[in-house]
């Protein structure tokens, strides 16, 4: 049985790999990055890297999902706030701006990721994107109905 400490250590190693990969992707470009470079930047051997990820695409997808998860965790409280649509929309946009500013490398990666996504992974990206757009659209529509957003 795996104890909590071991689980935490595995998660920390995985996160360290993702941070190393993000740096290499940013420095060298996604297409030119190799698993060797990711392993080296994260401070692990290739065997450890392949224990956690079977391919560069898997690393890419996990970074993308981590970025979206961080964004959602940051704006979720604003989405459920019981305030008017105008204040809610402005609050979400401000929070997103703060999150993006605090981790520029992650979000430069995240916003350029669609250029590199394999066809098999496009739906994952699209799901996150559509969810964000749907929430923002519903807030705007509510604001228009309540006459908080006008021409």
List PLM regions with ranges:
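Basic, helix-initiating cap at the start of DNA-binding domains
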Residues: 1-28, 33-41, 58
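Amphipathic, non-transmembrane alpha-helical scaffold segments
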Residues: 10, 18, 60, 64, ...
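Hydrophobic alpha-helical connector segments
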Residues: 62, 76-102
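Amphipathic alpha-helical packing segments from all-alpha helical-bundle domains
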Residues: 69, 76, 120-146
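Base-recognition residues in the alpha-helical recognition helix of bacterial helix-turn-helix
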Residues: 26, 50-54, 62, 66
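Short secondary-structure transition hinges
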Residues: 97-135
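Short hydrophobic/aromatic patch on the recognition helix
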Residues: 21, 43-53
């Amino acid at each position: 049985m795996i104890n909590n400490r071991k689980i935490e250590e595995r998660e920390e190693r995985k996160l360290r790999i993702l941070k190393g990969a993000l740096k290499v992707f940013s420095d060298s470009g996604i297409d030119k990055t190799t698993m060797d470079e990711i392993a080296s930047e994260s401070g692990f051997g290739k065997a450890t890297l392949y224990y956690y990820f079977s391919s560069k695409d898997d690393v890419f997808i996990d970074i993308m999902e981590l970025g979206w998860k961080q964004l959602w965790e940051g704006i979720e409280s604003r989405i459920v706030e019981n305030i008017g649509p105008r204040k809610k929309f402005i609050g979400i946009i401000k929070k997103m701006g703060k999150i993006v500013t605090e981790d520029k490398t992650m979000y430069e990666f995240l916003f350029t990721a669609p250029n590199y996504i394999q066809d098999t992974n496009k739906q994952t990206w699209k799901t996150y994107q559509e969810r964000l757009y749907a929430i923002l659209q519903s807030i705007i529509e509510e604001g228009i109905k309540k006459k908080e957003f006008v021409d």
